[in-house]
Amino acid sequence: MWHEARKHERKLRGMMVDYKKRAERRREYYEKIKKDPAQFLQVHGRACKVHLDSAVALAAESPVNMMPWQGDTNNMIDRFDVRAHLDHIPDYTPPLLTTISPEQESDERKCNYERYRGLVQNDFAGISEEQCLYQIYIDELYGGLQRPSEDEKKKLAEKKASIGYTYEDSTVAEVEKVAEKPEEEESPAEEESNSDEDEVIPDIDVEVDVDELNQEQVADLNKQATTYGMADGDFVRMLRKDKEEAEAIKHAKALEEEKAMYSGRRSRRQRREFREKRLRGRKISPPSYARRDSPTYDPYKRSPSESSSESRSRSRSPSPGREEKITFITSFGGSDEEAAAAAAAAAASGAAPGKPPAPPQPGGPAPGRNASARRRSSSSSASRTSSSRSSSRSSSRSRRGYYRSGRHARSRSRSWSRSRSRSRRYSRSRSRGRRHSDGGSRDGHRYSRSPARRSGYAPRRRSRSRSRSGDRYKRGARGPRHHSSSHSRSSWSLSPSRSRSLTRSGSRSQSRSRSRSQSHSQSQSHSPSPPREKLTRPAASPAVGEKLKKTEPAAGKETGAAKPKLTPQERLKLRMQKALNRQFKADKKAAQEKMIQQEHERQEREDELRAMARKIRMKERERREKEREEWERQYSRQSRSPSPRYSREYSSSRRRSRSRSRSPHYRH
């Protein structure tokens, strides 16, 4: 089977190759014999019989139907011929004053060039009219002489050169010269012999080459052309234009032939080479995406005024005096490890651990927490609003949570106005910090009981207390109108991760909540806006104030060690994630609206179908009632007059009524 398929494939391939070769030969043949169509135009006049029937032909040629034209008996025409009315052709006398516009004059000169250029060339070459007519007669009889084209001459020359080529010595040029010299020596002899033959038949088809003419010959040509209605200089100018047009046509034809040669399935490489050859001399500018590199986020230089005003808040690189040391977090949760990491970070940043911090200034950060202030103020400068400050605090707290407990940073870095589960997690961290900072708080008192008692609480009560404590923060920031919504939102569900983290017992969760509350109280006590602090925090007792002052240095060290600077790529990633979340919510909302709309349309369609079915049933019922009434009328009429005449009709109507009564519509 495989051999048969191979044989068939080989046969097909051979047929295709033969067809291609045949088409190539046919194309070459037609290219050879192709000429100007005007050269094939020949007009011949002969006497012939129009009618095949001899009787009809004799009747048509009888003197009754034929008449001499212009009195010439040798030239007989039909009397219905239109030439019978051309007995007298009046001579044309042009008007003396001719007003011709410049456009008409230029058109007339062009027409004269097309009419008489052959005669002008014959006059210039000294060829008489008899010689020209004889040459035309010879061409009509035998056709034009086939002269080898320039391409064929080049091919023959290449073949001759390749025969004389040797690899031992480079004598190719000499061989070519030797091969060309006999040709040049032979050519004058050939020309002499040809000239002897062409004395009788001069070659008048050779067009005058304008580029080879000198000034005298050009002037002579133009002078010869003026006798044929052309202006001085028109003939040579139009000859040049014709030559340029012929060159352009030849070039376009060569291009098309090259393209046709490269057509086919296997000629992709040849087409590419042809395209590269065409575009080799052209200069191509690089595309826009290759012209510039991707942006680099190196620290850029700033003006002295900007750097002096924002050096504390915007500087990313550490000063040469205090270079930061990179500390790697290797363990989570232990208080000893946290204290050691905080001490290492404080030593690296150059802060004295035993030195108490100065009171916070509203204009700038405290000196005891330079590292944390430097990192925090990169995301929120002193000129930004309080809302952006709170968002940067939440992002810093989420990163602290990532380093402490190994949670995913993105799930905590969202603002609590984004989604409900994230708002519950965020309010939980807020409420924990608030419970440890506010001694007189009711929720904090309830939450700070023993671990066993706390784990025994119902989930609803726990979520309610948590939502209330988070709601107090919301009330301080936004107003009292969010209490019911956050209470209802947070009381109906608890995420598994949240319930797991709440039921987890031991010193790890307590120390984590303690460190969170300390960092939260420290960040709120160092907030640069005093009115926000008044809104969000009630008045605390002096003991709580002392506790806060004691915990401030440790919290500053922790934030300085555990809060990294966000790179622009990470910032862009966060922004893209937020945009994706927004788009997801919008798509979800649009899908819900679409589903509601489809449901509404379905209900409307069902109602319409129900109404249509009801109408159809009513019409059917009315039709049945009409038929029944008609039948009863007919039956009563027949029962009144039971004559034998109507007995057949009566029986047929009875039969019809019986069949109708059997149908389900007429059952009583």
Curated annotation (Swiss-Prot):
Phosphoserine modification, residue list: 101, 285, 294, 331, 335, 541
Modified residue annotations for Phosphothreonine: 327, 567
Compartments, record wording: Nucleus
SMART domains: DRY_EERY
Compositional bias annotation for Acidic residues: 182-214
A GO CC term assigned to this protein in UniProt: nucleoplasm
A Pfam family that the UniProt record links to this protein: DRY_EERY
Record's compositionally biased regions (Basic and acidic residues): 290-313, 436-446, 584-611, 619-635
GO biological-process terms attached to the record: mRNA processing; RNA splicing
Entries under InterPro entries matching the protein: SWAP, SWAP_N_domain
The family this protein is said to belong to: Belongs to the splicing factor SR family.
Name by which UniProt lists this protein: CLK4-associating serine/arginine rich protein
Record organism: Rattus norvegicus
